[in-house]
Regions:
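Juxtacatalytic substrate-recognition/specificity segment
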Residues: 1-23, 27, 38, 128-129, ...
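Acidic/His/Gly-enriched intrinsically disordered linker/tail segments
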Residues: 21-101, 105-160, 275-351, 355-362, ...
Length: 405
């Protein structure tokens, strides 16, 4: 629905401006960003993604972007330059959306769309995008660009804020506790990862397994069957800036602290390095679980060293355990859990991640995530930072596991 509305608004832009909407002297960012804005408005009116979520998801995408164009590059564009800017790596359309989000926030409530319409009407009489902008919005385009840059920097570095939404059957006390725990772990995570989690997130708490599936279907625009598939074996599902949590599995206070710590660690890792190929799934899971354990220690729920002894003893006393090479992918992790049990798979991931941090230091994981961001491959980043491939480390770990019984 949003795509259809986007294209229809382009036609309206053309009609209002007498064909000047896409002229090189018009404002490219306002042409494309306003079409996305109208698409989001229509989607919301038709029961789809809300305008609020569209705005939050736009900034979520831009925070993860490895590179973006400068806003000034989206002012006047030749047809050839437009084609270049369509490459996803530039995130041109998301930045144009952000510029429109900033612009409409400056308009009186209820007048936002009318002001955009005035701009395209003004283009019918003047080919200058800047002049039409001044007529429609009561400020110079240069002034807006300056204010946008300030707004954009603030938005990109906005400290983490969680809007916790309790679905029916979830107590207000539980929702308040989740919000408190999510805020409490932020300084610890910033110390671990060398940067802080930024942005606004909606944390939707589902009451039980059935409600979890329903919440996924409602908020992720997927079918019930797809929602059921996503929910299987998951404590949470992420869709951009929206996190849906199976609150019925959060358990007591201790489990809640661990789970919220792990969840926030995952969000921060996604912010640092999201586009990943050639996964190292055991390291992904192991590290967010270690973050959860650090959160427990911070909350006075045991010492990290004691938890470490627990997983060390578990994997050393176990008979056959999966090889780390079996745990490189999400499918491999799932198959290992089905054959060996969730506990030993999780303990092995914790053991492997902790051994790596013991040898190379926690700062090595920051370097690893930066290399993942640069290279796009987790396994290549692993070789780059740790000086061995995952297969070699798997052999080293198995020797360490069996030689210390």
């Amino acid at each position: 629905m949003s795509t259809t509305a986007h294209e229809l608004f382009h036609q309206l832009q053309y009609d209002l401006s007498h064909g000047n909407d896409a002229a090189e002297q018009a404002l490219f960012w306002l042409e494309e960003g306003s079409a996305d804005y109208v698409g989001a408005l229509v989607a919301e009116q038709c029961g789809g993604k809300s305008l609020h979520k569209w705005e939050q998801d736009t900034m979520f995408d831009l925070r993860r972007a490895q590179e973006t164009v400068n806003a000034k590059e989206l002012v006047h564009c030749s047809p050839q330059r437009r084609m270049q800017l369509m490459e996803k790596k530039y995130h041109s359309y998301q930045l144009a959306d952000a510029m429109v989000i900033c612009l409409v926030q400056k308009q009186a409530k209820g007048t936002e769309l009318a002001a955009i319409v005035r701009y395209f009407q003004a283009l019918a009489d003047t080919r200058s995008g800047e002049e039409a902008f001044s007529q429609a919005f009561g400020m110079t385009h240069a002034q807006f660009l300056q204010e946008f840059q300030q707004w954009y920097v603030q938005e990109r570095h906005l400290p983490f804020a969680a809007h916790v939404i309790a679905r029916p059957g979830v107590s207000a006390a539980l929702a308040a506790d989740v919000k408190t725990q999510a805020a409490a772990v932020q300084p610890m995570l910033a110390g671990m990862y060398g940067q802080r989690l930024c942005g606004r997130y909606d944390l939707i708490l589902a009451a039980d397994a059935a409600d979890f599936i329903q919440a996924i279907a409602e908020n992720c625009a997927v079918t019930q069957d797809k929602a059921r598939e996503l929910a299987t074996g998951s404590l949470w599902i992420q869709d951009g800036s929206t996190i849906i949590v199976q609150a019925g599995e959060l358990g007591d206070g201790k489990q809640r602290i661990f789970s919220v710590g792990a969840l926030c660690a995952r969000l921060l890792e996604t912010q640092v390095a999201d586009k990943r190929e050639e996964s190292v799934a055991w390291l992904d899971r192991g590290m967010i679980y270690l973050a959860g354990i650090r959160a427990l220690e911070q909350a006075g729920q045991g010492r990290y060293a004691d938890y470490r002894r627990g997983w060390q003893q578990a994997v050393r006393r176990a008979g056959a355990v999966p090889s780390l090479e079996q745990l490189l992918t999400a499918d491999g992790m799932r198959e290992a859990s089905e054959s060996c049990g969730d506990d030993i798979v999780n303990e092995l991931a914790e053991f492997a991640a902790d051994e790596l941090m013991t040898r190379f230091g926690w700062s090595s994981y920051r370097a690893y995530l930066q290399q993942v961001r640069r290279l796009g491959s987790e396994r290549e980043a692993f070789r780059e930072v740790y000086g061995r491939d995952t297969a070699a480390y798997a052999r080293e770990l198995e020797l360490a596991r069996t030689s210390r019984r």
